[in-house]
Amino acid sequence: MNYKNKILVSESGLTQKHLIHGDEELFQHELRTIXARNWLFLTHDSLIPSPGDYVTAKMGIDEVIVSRQSDGSIRAFLNVCRHRGKTLVNAEAGNAKGFVCSYHGWGFGSNGELQSVPFEKELYGESLNKKCLGLKEVARVESFHGFIYGCFDQEAPSLMDYLGDAAWYLEPIFKHSGGLELVGPPGKVVIKANWKAPAENFVGDAYHVGWTHASSLRTGESIFSSLAGNAVLPPEGAGLQMTSKYGSGMGVLWDGYSGVHSADLVPELMAFGGAKQERLNKEIGDVPARIYRSHLNCTVFPNNSVLTCSGVFKVWNPIDANTTEVWTYAIVEKDMPEDLKRRLADAVQRTFGPAGFWESDDNDNMETASQNGKKYQSRDSDLISNLGFGKDVYGDAVYPGVVGKSAIGETSYRGFYRAYQAHVSSSNWAEFEDASSTWHTELTKTTDR
């Protein structure tokens, strides 16, 4: 199918065709236009601190080796032997000077170069040009305050430009907190859902919390417990939503809402964060310092999500149109007491890990919504994301990006899917930029006409 003129998402991101969650042909197109073009999360500095340290990660449906080099830099390569295509590294993580294929024994350095071939002189003579047979390298690897992302496309904007307005909201936590650590290895589980279903849920959906998580809310003591069953709405001014040019966005829930998913840790988290916020008020200003202590439910387009303060860090690795492998890490602040780090990491797996009770709540929604996207009658129906439409602003004096000043809305949905439509209808970054030249004007319309 030619997707160049195929409207899967309406202008302003108000509706999406249900088939985007279930169509296998479209999924293959996404691998070319989304996974091969955008910045994808690989790992964190804290997981590969020393030369020779490596992890394996996913970029779309491809697996890569991410390795710390002898000079401290980080490079990434397809986890595929150049001889006969076997998977090179089976371990999730380790430390090695190089990698040897278990099929025919070809050996590659941690820099990706082909270094040794059994019986090279006897079998190949002078015909083997090892310089041309190194591992295929990921074109771009960059860091956002220790969080490492890779991109196959040389024409992509820098990682910082790609994050765009979303970076301003993330930096109080990722940078000014004193730094973060990622606790691995990740918990992994396969769900029968399209990768976009969890990505959109985490991009800023506070609307579902009272219904979907009613039973979970009732199990603990937190400021969010009163929302069980949508008994009450969050008070006016409880938060905001934002989105950016390249699709990354989030919901922000101010102040005391931060510890909802780790209810038993709320007193410790509030005490730890409160002391640091006082310092940050002076260093970076009241609003960024308030963001540091608030709860951000964010998706970095396309498939990396984080719940700050709750310590939840997700990667939604696509397998096919209706299957996703979910990787769940915990994020902790570097200067947290070790006991608090451990307990927060445990709380992440208990709530949003493979068997977490909040995770289980969400998975049923995501799976059935995705599976219905491939059914004959429902696939061409429109899914709606018009909550708060007409109230969003761009160019706010304080808050960057397109902003909806309500805790509950779908501002970030619309921005996510506007970027998605621009990518699937574009052949390259230049075409995406042309399609996005009026992005904030589209998203701040007051009418759908």
UniProtKB/Swiss-Prot annotation:
Name the cofactor(s) required for activity, per the record.
Answer: [2Fe-2S] cluster; Fe(2+)
Cite the Gene3D superfamilies for this sequence.
Naphthalene 1,2-dioxygenase Alpha Subunit, Chain A, domain 1 (3.90.380.10), Rieske [2Fe-2S] iron-sulphur domain (2.102.10.10)
Cofactor annotation remark = Binds 1 [2Fe-2S] cluster per subunit. Binds 1 Fe(2+) ion per subunit.
Reactions that this protein is recorded to catalyse = naphthalene + NADH + O2 + H(+) = (1R,2S)-1,2-dihydronaphthalene-1,2-diol + NAD(+)
Where does this protein hold Fe cation? 208, 213, 362
Question: What is the E.C. number?
Answer: 1.14.12.12
Sequence positions that bind [2Fe-2S] cluster: 81, 83, 101, 104
Does the keyword section mention NAD? yes
Kindly list the biological process annotations in GO that this record carries. catabolic process
Cysteine pairings via disulfide bonds:
none
Do the record's keywords include S-adenosyl-L-methionine?
no
Tell me which UniProt keywords the record has, alphabetically: 2Fe-2S, Aromatic hydrocarbons catabolism, Dioxygenase, Iron, Iron-sulfur, Metal-binding, NAD, Oxidoreductase, Plasmid
- Pathway it works in: Aromatic compound metabolism; naphthalene degradation
Function summary:
Component of the naphthalene dioxygenase (NDO) multicomponent enzyme system which catalyzes the incorporation of both atoms of molecular oxygen into naphthalene to form cis-(1R,2S)-dihydroxy-1,2-dihydronaphthalene. The alpha subunit has a catalytic role in the holoenzyme.
Could you say which protein family the record assigns here? Belongs to the bacterial ring-hydroxylating dioxygenase alpha subunit family.
Quaternary assembly: The naphthalene dioxygenase (NDO) multicomponent enzyme system is composed of an electron transfer component and a dioxygenase component (iron sulfur protein (ISP)). The electron transfer component is composed of a ferredoxin reductase (NdoR) and a ferredoxin (NdoA), and the dioxygenase component is formed of a heterohexamer (trimer of heterodimers) of three large alpha subunits (NdoB) and three small beta subunits (NdoC).
The name of this protein is: Naphthalene 1,2-dioxygenase system, large oxygenase component
Q: Which organism is it from?
A: Pseudomonas fluorescens
> Which taxonomic lineage is given here?
Bacteria, Pseudomonadati, Pseudomonadota, Gammaproteobacteria, Pseudomonadales
